[in-house]
Amino acid sequence: MARYTGPKSRIARKFGEGIFGADKVLSKKNYPPGQHGNNRRRKTSEYGVMLAEKQKAKYTYGVLEKQFRNLFEKAASANGITGEILLQSLEARLDNVVFRLGIAPTRAAARQLVSHKHITVDGKVVNIPSFSVKPGQIVGVRERSKSLEVIANSLAGFNHSKYPWLEWDESSKVGKLLHIPERADIPENIKEHLIVELYSK
């Protein structure tokens, strides 16, 4: 399955929430897309509910099925609560950390910045969006990229105290992952236990 590149409002309406951020269309059309969307609210099977939750997580973090499955398998083999570890692994992805630091306005934009070699980790360019950032590592903007309009606009007025597991130095345009976030601190509306149940079937 390729990464979805179509209208984000369509996906937001599918799940009934703005999984990509604030969505003006969703506030007007809070029902599934399609010709009969306003009349299509129907009971979903147990499997359908679990599958939808997995899709929501994949769309939210912009992860493909193979990557998502690999992250789940690693989480399942680790000590701790599988669903929480899965979300923590998604939060540790470099593209997500770039987004959380306010360097990019969306995760999709963050992926582009990483892929186009605008982002550094501990001073070295890393162009792999799925790179897992470890606590203590420094994520920054490459010197020649600091004047990019998309970065400047995204950082302007961004509240860097939103996420207590991250630290930001405005003067040098670098951030640090202080620690892996607790589940209660992760703001995404994802029922990870349903994903665990789906993969356990």
From Swiss-Prot:
Keywords: Ribonucleoprotein, Ribosomal protein, RNA-binding, rRNA-binding. It holds the Pfam family Ribosomal_S4. GO terms for molecular function: rRNA binding; structural constituent of ribosome. Gene3D superfamilies: Ribosomal Protein S4 Delta 41, Chain A, domain 1, RNA-binding S4 domain. It comes from the Bacteria. One of its GO terms (cellular component) is small ribosomal subunit. Coiled coil: none annotated. PANTHER family: 30S 40S RIBOSOMAL PROTEIN, SMALL RIBOSOMAL SUBUNIT PROTEIN US4M. Belongs to the universal ribosomal protein uS4 family. HAMAP family: Ribosomal_uS4_B. One of the primary rRNA binding proteins, it binds directly to 16S rRNA where it nucleates assembly of the body of the 30S subunit. With S5 and S12 plays an important role in translational accuracy. Part of the 30S ribosomal subunit. Contacts protein S5. The interaction surface between S4 and S5 is involved in control of translational fidelity. NCBIfam families: PRK05327.1, rpsD_bact. This is Small ribosomal subunit protein uS4. It comes from Phocaeicola vulgatus (strain ATCC 8482 / DSM 1447 / JCM 5826 / CCUG 4940 / NBRC 14291 / NCTC 11154). The gene is rpsD.
